[in-house]
Structures are given as structure tokens and as C-alpha cells.
A protein has these predicted regions:
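Membrane-proximal intracellular helices of multi-pass ion channels
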Residues: 1-281
Length: 281
């Protein structure tokens, strides 16, 4: 539930070699990616808030869609086992990466560039705001996508008034601007870190994957820093750069100071409550 990714065994998840263990971990890791305020509402019997929540729907769709792509890719490249085995391995990897848990029972880098691309996108997306997961957060990306759609519509209809709405509630222009600023800073840090690591001799795949992994608090990156590798070979300046990327990820902590309003005496649905505007900052 903490999406930390550490294990009591050096071999990690592979130590148990148990499909049952992987399914249980997948379920609880997926739940950990949901806004905790919504999880609380579900535990107290109000499942409608969880099931009808727009961000939860997007989160579920991304997980299922990415899992389907991975399964399809494994079958096309003839790297699949039985259907159950392929489904379990794919779902586990997708959930553990999108929630920034970082457990990897398989080396997606060895599967090929197609799979690495999928998991890098999941690292960037992250799970829902109000969870312990890293990444840009789906809630912010939903607001960004809707705002982009509105701006494209205004190109044709300049006088149109189209507020960004989440679960039927309008999001103020001020909050949209702050979300755009957050995403911009996130991307700028990602680009800067990738350039520095590239200058130190890392391939573009390794530089980008390593920076994104640290920025989103994932763990495994891409190339030599993927699930089968580590960060030991990176020069000291590169390690300092990655540590700075990890510190930049603490921008997400800004939402935590406001999250207490939801968990202590304020149990309103996050996307129907005014505090949603702060949690998306």
C-alpha cells in the first residue's frame, strides 16, 4: 500500500515464485494507486463515489489498456507462455510501474523497445492524486487534456466559453494554470536531467529512462538501468543529477498539506470538493 517497492528478500518478488502472491500484490498495489479519500469512502460503504469517479475510471482504463498492449506484444513477438501466465506477468508489471512501486518480476527491457516505451509512458503518467504514487498523476493529465481540447475548440470558435470540468464540476482557470505550470516544470527537469546524463556518456534511452524513473520515484529505468541492471556504473555527477531529480519529485508533497482537509473531518469526494483544486496543484 505504501508503493515503496522494498522487499524483505534480496530477490524481491521473484523469491516467492508464486502466482497467488503476485495476484494479491497486484490487487493491493492497484488500490494504493487510487485516491485514499475515495478508498475511505468505499471502505465505509459508499462505493458509488469510487465507481463513478472520473479519475478512477481513467486510471482503470490506462491499466487495462496497457496490460492489453503488453499481452498483445508478447504474443506477436512470440515471448508468451500460457494465457494465465502472460496475463499475470503483464498486469503485475503494468500496475507496479504505474503506481511507482517498482517491483519487476520480468525484464521489460529484454522484451524489446515497444515494451520499454509503454512502461516509460506509465512512469510519466503515474496513478491518482491523493495516493502515495509518483508520476505526473492522472488527475493533472486529465485536466491538461480537457484544457487542450477546449483550446483547440476555441481556435474554430474564439468566443466559446468552455470551462474545464471534472466530474461535472468546473475547475478554475487559476488551478488549470498551476497544473500546466507543474507539468511544464516536470518536463523541464526531465529534459535537463536527460541532457546531463547523455553528456556523461549514457545512451539517450538510459539517460531519459533513468531520469524519468527517479523523477517519478519508480526504481527501474531503461537500458542498463532497467530491471536487470542498476545505477552503479553512472558517474558521480550523474548520481547527483538523479538525486536532484528524486528531490524534484517532492513537488508532489505540496498536495499533502491540503490532503489532511479531506481525511480529517472532510470526507467529501475529492473531485466534488473544493479541495480537489488544491490537490491537483
Amino acid at each position: 500500500m505504501a508503493t515503496g517497492g522494498f522487499s524483505t528478500k534480496q530477490a524481491g518478488i521473484n523469491f516467492w515464485n508464486s502466482s497467488y502472491t503476485e495476484y494479491v500484490m497486484t490487487i493491493f498495489t492497484f488500490i494504493a494507486g487510487i485516491n485514499f479519500a475515495l478508498v475511505y469512502r468505499a471502505v465505509t460503504g459508499d462505493f458509488k463515489k469510487l465507481l463513478h469517479n472520473e479519475e478512477t475510471k481513467w486510471y482503470t482504463a490506462i491499466v487495462l489498456g496497457a496490460t492489453l498492449l503488453v499481452i498483445t506484444g508478447l504474443y506477436i513477438t512470440d515471448q508468451n507462455g500460457s494465457f494465465e501466465d502472460t496475463f499475470r506477468r503483464s498486469l503485475f508489471l503494468v500496475v507496479t510501474i504505474v503506481t511507482s512501486t517498482g517491483y519487476t518480476g520480468d525484464d521489460y527491457v529484454a522484451w524489446g523497445p515497444f515494451f520499454t516505451t509503454i512502461f516509460l509512458l506509465l512512469m510519466f503518467f503515474g496513478a491518482c492524486a491523493g495516493s502515495t504514487c509518483g508520476g505526473a498523476k492522472i488527475d493533472r493529465l486529465v485536466v491538461l487534456a480537457k484544457n487542450t481540447k477546449n483550446e483547440l475548440y476555441r481556435v474554430i470558435h474564439p468566443n466559446a466559453i468552455l470551462p474545464v470540468r471534472v466530474n461535472g464540476k468546473a475547475v478554475s482557470h487559476e488551478i488549470v494554470s498551476k497544473i500546466l505550470a507543474f507539468i511544464l516544470v516536470y518536463v523541464m527537469v526531465l529534459i535537463a536531467g536527460s541532457i546531463i546524463l547523455s553528456a556523461l556518456g549514457l545512451s539517450m534511452e538510459e539517460a531519459f529512462g533513468s531520469t524519468l524513473s527517479c523523477l517519478s520515484n519508480i526504481g527501474p529505468g531503461a537500458g542498463s538501468t532497467g530491471p536487470a541492471g542498476n545505477y552503479a556504473f553512472i558517474p558521480d555527477l550523474g548520481k547527483w543529477t538523479l538525486e536532484s531529480s528524486c528531490s524534484s519529485a517532492d513537488l508532489n508533497c505540496l498536495q499533502s498539506s491540503f490532503y489532511s482537509h479531506l481525511t480529517f473531518g472532510k470526507t467529501h469526494n475529492i473531485v466534488e470538493d473544493k479541495y480537489f483544486l488544491y490537490i491537483c496543484i
